[in-house]
């Protein structure tokens, strides 16, 4: 794909499960290709103005949010405790445990991005609030649905 060495500086969470694409099914590889420029970083766009986009991600146990691309500086906050599995465009797979209120911040330089999915592997609903800063080094990706 592309150079992902900058990812080592991002606050990626969780336990590293896999480091290459060998464990990925073909449908998942296809999804990452088809969604490689998908800026829908949440399941519902709650608010947008000239400074920020505020998203919600709400996943039932076993549910996943498809591959999507982050290009804007952003942060997420876990609304409740839970667990997820994430596949990342560099082939890594991580399993992550979250505490309620846990927050992580991400910064992207020009041309940098994070392409990943998220699946709820816990026993309870997993809810996040994600805030993207529109005044970042990269232009915002266009939104196709926004699910507002």
PLM feature segments, named:
Residues 70-91:
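Glycine- and acidic-residue-biased ligand/ion/polar-headgroup-sensing regions
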Residues 59-62, 101:
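Tight coil/turn sites that cap or link beta-strands
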Residues 61, 71, 80, 110-112, ...:
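Short loop/turn positions at the edges of beta-strands in beta-sheet-rich folds
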Residues 66-71, 116, 120:
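His-enriched metal-coordination microenvironments in redox/metal-binding proteins
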Residues 2-55, 88, 93-115, 119, ...:
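A short, N-terminal "cap"/entry segment at the start of jelly-roll beta-barrel domains
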Residues 39, 47-52, 60, 69-71, ...:
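Short, surface-exposed loop/turn motifs at beta-strand boundaries within globular domains
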Residues 64, 83, 103-105:
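Residue-level marker of beta-strand positions
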């Amino acid at each position: 794909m592309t150079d992902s060495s900058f990812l080592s500086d991002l606050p990626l969470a969780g336990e590293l499960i896999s480091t290459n694409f060998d464990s990925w099914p073909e449908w998942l590889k296809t999804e990452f290709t088809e969604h490689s420029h998908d800026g829908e970083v949440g399941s519902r766009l709650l608010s947008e103005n000239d400074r920020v986009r505020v998203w919600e991600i709400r996943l039932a146990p076993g549910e996943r949010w498809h591959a999507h691309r982050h290009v804007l500086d952003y942060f997420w906050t876990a609304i409740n405790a839970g667990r997820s599995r994430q596949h990342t465009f560099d082939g890594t797979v991580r399993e992550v445990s979250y505490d309620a209120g846990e927050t992580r911040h991400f910064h992207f330089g020009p041309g940098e991005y994070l392409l990943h999915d998220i699946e709820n592997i816990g026993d309870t609903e997993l809810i996040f609030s994600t805030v993207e800063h529109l005044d970042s080094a990269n232009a915002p990706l266009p939104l196709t649905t926004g699910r507002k």
